[in-house]
Curated annotation (Swiss-Prot):
Cited PANTHER family: METHYLATED-DNA--PROTEIN-CYSTEINE METHYLTRANSFERASE
KW Nucleus (keyword) present: no
Annotated protein name in UniProt: Probable methylated-DNA--protein-cysteine methyltransferase
Pfam family of the protein (one): DNA_binding_1
Active site: 118
Domain of life from the UniProt record: Viruses
EC number of the protein: 2.1.1.63
PROSITE patterns associated with the record: MGMT
Length: 149
């Protein structure tokens, strides 16, 4: 399913498509006061990609996952822009030093990429996977490094 929000002269319209994006499931007007957090997120993403590191403030995230995953993601939110931590660092920080593999799995299940910056979590040799491909992870890390100097 794909959701698209379009700003029109008479208000915001939400369109929901099927998985193949060939059929429209729903079209409806939405109350713009209900999507303020979405606008904050979009503004934050624009700031992020301009290299500003005050990009995500006052966001109310709904982290849907297991209690362990949410604990990992909350810890990852603490990693500063331009820095990295290892999977082991995160496991130790949440009080479960043997859960390195589980931390890696939680990173792979992160539903809020970039905002919950799992790309900042690396293996001991500065490697590790990324749900959206290693090329994107390396680009994000390099981008952040360049914008902290």
């Amino acid at each position: 399913m794909k959701i698209e929000i379009i700003e029109t002269k008479i208000g915001l319209v939400k369109i929901i498509y099927d998985d193949t994006q060939t059929k429209i499931i729903s079209v409806m007007f939405i109350d713009s006061s209900k999507i303020k957090p979405v606008k904050n997120s979009l503004s934050g993403l624009h700031k992020y990609f301009k290299g500003q590191n005050d990009y995500f403030t006052n966001l109310d995230l709904e982290l849907k996952g297991t209690p362990f995953q949410r604990k990992v993601w909350k810890q990852i939110l603490e990693i500063p822009f331009g820095e990295t931590r290892t999977y082991s660092d995160i496991a130790m920080a949440i009080g479960n030093p043997k859960a390195v593999r589980a931390v890696a799995n939680a990173c792979g299940a992160n539903p809020i990429a970039i905002i919950v910056p799992c790309h900042r979590v690396v293996g001991k040799n500065n490697d590790g996977g990324y749900e959206y491909g290693l090329e994107k992870k390396l680009w994000l890390l390099d981008f952040e490094k360049k914008n902290t100097q």
